[in-house]
Amino acid sequence: MLRDMFGYDTISMIDIALYGQFSENNYNGVNCGIMDQFAIAMGKKDCAIFLDTSDLKYEYAPVKLEGARIVISCSNKKRGLGDSKYNERRSECETALAEIQKVKDIKSLGELTEEEFEAVKDAIKDPVRQKRAKHAVYENQRTVQAVAALKANDIAKFGELMNASHVSLRDDYEVTGIELDTLVEEAWNCPGVIGSRMTGAGFGGCTISLVRTDDVDNFIKKVGRSYRSEERRVGKECRSRWSPYH
């Protein structure tokens, strides 16, 4: 919009992403990173982006979903990140990082392998903060593995990593909730599902699932029906949309 409507052709797309992050941090009260803004600015057809947020170095990983589609399921649970526990999770991770830095020279939790984290985790005094940090470390390693899976066109492995990611987001980072968990758990029980997890910051919003093409229609019906059957409990109706990937 800055380029098209106001003629700011000299501004790079990465700078525009940084401006978006600045606006979220300073005007919307959300202490977010740059992932969403970077994906919007630098997205490329049929590719995922592998981004190092510490220095904004990135590479594209091919997304070849032959015989499968991406299905987005909306929980219809609205949330504002400024009013959610999003900022609290960020603060918990920052405190955990400061505790680890007393015993190990690192700049971010993402620098740690799982083994390195297990060796220093007792430096984090609070068990809740320890869980938050564990998620950050293990999720980072899952991301590295996911890129390798995409490059190898190993969609089954990618799906396994999606599932493990949701479990960690549910149990260690605790940002899912009954609506997202219901959608994901119903997806896991559907034929043809390769993987499913919440997407975004959590506390509502959507799930993303990889589903075999021939099973998409049944998936949408089954997950929607199961979610509606829980309506008295979750009070929402599911909407699903599938992508043109095949």
Please give the residue ranges for each predicted region.
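Short, small-residue alpha-helix embedded
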Residues: 1-5, 204-211
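Fold-level recognition of mixed alpha/beta catalytic cores in primary-metabolism enzymes, strongest
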Residues: 1-72
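C-terminal nucleotide
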Residues: 42, 47-195, 210-233
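Glycine-centered loop/turn positions within well-structured domains
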Residues: 47, 205, 240
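Positively charged, low-complexity/disordered segments
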Residues: 235-246
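Conserved phosphate/anionic-ligand binding catalytic regions in large, soluble enzymes, centered on
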Residues: 32-40, 197-206
